[in-house]
Amino acid sequence: MRGVFIAGVIAAFAITVVDSLNCTQCYTYNSTCDGQATECNEQSFSCVESSINSTLGGFLHVYQNKFCSASNCTENSTEVAFTVHLFDDQRYHFASQCCQGESCNATHSESGTQNVTDMQCMSCYGHNKTLCEEKPQKCYEGEQCVFIIAEMVNGSGRVELKGCSDISNSTCQFLSPGNTTVGEFVFKSVECTQPTEYTNSTTTIPPITNTSLTSVTRPGIKTSPASVTPQASMGTKASFTSSIFGSLLLLKLLF
């Protein structure tokens, strides 16, 4: 009988060890997010890592958030990572990973040296109701055209992206149904198409229309009514870019 009791205690201890979840936890903006994996509370079932590396507006912005999550990953490991290239050498790199049973691996790196082709996608970016002025962007080898509308989980900020992307076909299929949540982000709409032969043209498409959304600004920063033109000054450009990231970071849209 004593042997049975001891075996039961060992089994219970083993279950406790298996059920414990350790995740790296840190949050940074424009700095490195490093931290040791620590044990999560009992309500957490997954580790989540999200990051954005962007040069929209001509300024570098880096955002990272690693945390324990009460959400269950749809698979043992769900990872989405891709870069969107836009006009004027602007880019938006998005990465998010949800893991169960272990801390996420830091494998979100952008592609190295690439060869430019004579194929193109129309590119632009917009925030909430701002205009998205399309311009042609030459693509690198292996890229396809994307049209992405994404927002943070709480709906406080929305971003629209068009351009050339290294997004994989499997990721396109995973996100294309719409309203797909990955980490802190909800991909409202994702379209992937093949690029066309390069031509130099510019068009303006209507702004994002969603009357239920309200403008979100960072405390202490005044923003004028959004109107983006190619002749906008660098000051206006910086204000517009800060507005984009200000609303994104209020959650805690590459992607």
Curated annotation (Swiss-Prot):
Keyword Transferase listed: no
Expressing tissues: Specifically present in enterocytes located at the uppermost epithelial layer of the colon (at protein level). Exclusively expressed in the large intestine: specifically expressed on the apical surface of epithelial cells located at the uppermost layer of the colonic gland.
Bilayer disposition of the protein: Lipid-anchor; GPI-anchor
Mutation effect (N53D): In mutant N-D: Abolished N-glycosylation
Recorded superkingdom: Eukaryota
CDD domains (UniProt xref): TFP_LU_ECD_LYPD8_rpt1, TFP_LU_ECD_LYPD8_rpt2
UniProt feature coiled coil, ranges: none
Effect listed in the UniProt record for changing N72D: In mutant N-D: Abolished N-glycosylation
Record propeptide residues: 234-255
Family per similarity comment: Belongs to the CNF-like-inhibitor family.
Name this polypeptide is given: Ly6/PLAUR domain-containing protein 8
Organism name: Mus musculus (Mouse)
Gene from which this protein is expressed: Lypd8
